[in-house]
Amino acid sequence: MRFGIVARRDREEALKLAYRVYDYLKVRGYDAIVDSETYEHFPHFKEEDIAKLEEFDVDFIIAIGGDGTILRIEHKTKKDIPILSINMGTLGFLTEVEPSETFFAINRLLRGEYYIDERIKLRTYINGEARIPDALNEVAILTGIPGKVIHLRYYVDGGLADEVRADGLVVATPTGSTGYAMSAGGPFVDPRLDTIIIAPLLPLPRTSVPMVVPGYSKIEIEFVTKREVILAVDGQYYEHLSPDIKIRIEKSPRKTKFVRFTREIYPKYTMRIKERH
């Protein structure tokens, strides 16, 4: 069994725990590969065990950090590798275990006492070209000038769904329903569902409301506004776009896979949402 290890780079506790995990696996005879960016911030791993995330070819990834660490993994890895996530972030909607449970969780993984939780992702086409990372949480179309609204139309499966004047538009997965989409007034959606959430950001007037559409839907966005806009994917990738382009968003053929030890969803999500608000 071969493992990849990725840690949050701005917390020494996460980096030290990553080294303990690395040593724990190596002593027991398992292959362990460490993300090169983790190594740059904590250069105590063996150099022959270092690789870029884009080059990871492992059975599992152990992620030590918060949701941002998981999103970084998802944007850079080329394969759908199951992730065991250890929470060293702020809220940790995506993470599975706390730091104190790390080695208990790893032992359960080694014994096969887990299941794989698959989450849908979104693929974005700009003028028909899929050249940006898939989104685990959301794709956000944002105003390029603070204080200036975007005027756009969006279509669902070819039919006009709404014409919106707003600070932006968020298209989210159920996993991302607790993120930017919820800040835009969208609902919490069970992350196991196959749906897509569309939520305008501060629309004028407030007659434009969030909607939930089937996961097989194709969402097309065209701009009436003539100003530059910003496209943001999971808060990790940003690009300035001219308003004459067309955007299509649909479910990606790829999925995110998480190692889980319980099938309970609501206790954790309810607690995290209350902590956030």
UniProtKB/Swiss-Prot annotation:
InterPro entries: ATP-NAD_kinase_N, ATP-NAD_kinase_PpnK-typ_C, NAD/diacylglycerol_kinase_sf, NADK
Keyword list, A-Z: ATP-binding, Cytoplasm, Kinase, NAD, NADP, Nucleotide-binding, Transferase
Active-site residues per Swiss-Prot or TrEMBL entry: D67 (proton acceptor)
MF terms in GO: ATP binding; metal ion binding; NAD+ kinase activity
Needed co-factor(s): a divalent metal cation
Keyword Transmembrane helix among UniProt keywords: no
Role description: Involved in the regulation of the intracellular balance of NAD and NADP, and is a key enzyme in the biosynthesis of NADP. Catalyzes specifically the phosphorylation on 2'-hydroxyl of the adenosine moiety of NAD to yield NADP.
Family the entry assigns: Belongs to the NAD kinase family.
Protein name from the UniProt record: NAD kinase
Annotated source species: Pyrococcus abyssi (strain GE5 / Orsay)
